[in-house]
């Protein structure tokens, strides 16, 4: 029996931000056509039991054929999710496209504009996305695509390790909050090694936010229980259950295809992943056999 896979497609590396904490630093500048990505999708489906494709970048909303590619995947009967910084999203886009996605994930490393500028999570003019704008976008997704799940990805570095974001997460009622430790990289003059966090600093950041989240969830459950008693309801009132996923180490735990169409393996060196399969030329099934994948870590992320 084939094992189910969720496959990350980094359809381009270009981005309108320059985040130092971004882990999508593969040194790939290629822009494959929609037809090429369709071939890769078909290759993946032929070689594995694919449960979902997760579209990422760079900033995937910069890709000119995004909607066409997503529709192609959906027509194959496979779910699609999107990871975005949200800067190019507006109400019209949400009305037209949000319903196509299983999950829309926003990359939010800080709710402080100055911290975002230090991280590089801003445009060339230094304009960052206000936290309130992400709240608005999430509200619009809830309005126009209520079945779409909302996820927040937060990458922790020395620049934001002391921040508590649980109140923000609570405000947008995120279904999932992924807290990741920043992946170190150094390509020529570009490096983030000076803003790494220690094991202890990362764990402290996670626990600080997890504890605040727990307190809020307990208070919410108490309020909902009181409402249920007052209403005399026979059936329990559904309470939001926010899932927090912590990733201190991303090695050997992703099935990831870069913007060149290559399946990458980062088990040996996280800073320099190795291409184990050109998915436009080789069978994806063969690439999977060569890929180092820690099934326990991989399945813990998605289950």
What is each residue range found by the language model?
Residues 58-60, 85-87, 109-111, 155-157, ...:
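Active-site beta-loop-alpha junctions enriched in small/polar residues
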Residues 1-81, 88-95:
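Conserved alpha-helical substructure of the radical SAM core
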Residues 74, 98, 142:
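Anion (oxyanion) recognition and catalysis
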Residues 92-111, 168-179:
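Structural recognition of alpha->loop->beta junctions
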Residues 113-287:
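Radical SAM enzyme [4Fe-4S]-AdoMet core and its adjacent flexible, acidic
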